[in-house]
């Protein structure tokens, strides 16, 4: 007959093995996968814009239908986010002032950056 220490050890190992098996089966069960998919589907898709593009002027929608009014959207990330929407006529009227404004902001940032380090 096995000693009481051996029986207790076997029971302890059996309980640990059972816990491990239950944890693995719940992780791999289809119900767990469905729950994960539901969690992921609730998250709205993130619209990420890399900061490396900061300072570049870029139209958002270049493939507009012919005959549609030209619209330009300018976005950049300096120390803050800026977004501007202009029609083609407005852009023609204000392009020089807008260019000077952007240049002043970017030059100020470039001058301040080495001083921060």
Curated annotation (Swiss-Prot):
Its main location: secreted. The keyword Lyase does not apply. O-octanoylated by GOAT/MBOAT4. O-octanoylation is essential for ghrelin activity. It comes from the Eukaryota. One of its GO terms (cellular component) is extracellular region. Keywords: Amidation, Hormone, Lipoprotein, Secreted, Signal. A lipid is attached at residue 26 (O-octanoyl serine). Residues 1-23 form the signal peptide. This is Appetite-regulating hormone. It comes from Papio hamadryas. The lineage of its organism: Eukaryota, Metazoa, Chordata, Craniata, Vertebrata. The gene is GHRL.
């Amino acid at each position: 007959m096995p000693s009481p220490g051996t029986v207790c050890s076997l029971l302890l190992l059996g309980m640990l093995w059972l816990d491990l098996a239950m944890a693995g089966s719940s992780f791999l069960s289809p119900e767990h996968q469905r729950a994960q998919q539901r969690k992921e589907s609730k998250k709205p898709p993130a619209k990420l814009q890399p900061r490396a593009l900061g300072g570049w002027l870029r139209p958002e929608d270049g493939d507009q239908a012919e005959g549609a009014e030209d619209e330009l959207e300018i976005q950049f990330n300096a120390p803050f986010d800026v977004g501007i929407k202009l029609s083609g006529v407005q852009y023609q009227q204000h392009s020089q002032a807008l260019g000077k404004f952007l240049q002043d902001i970017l030059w100020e940032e470039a001058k301040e950056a080495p001083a921060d380090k």
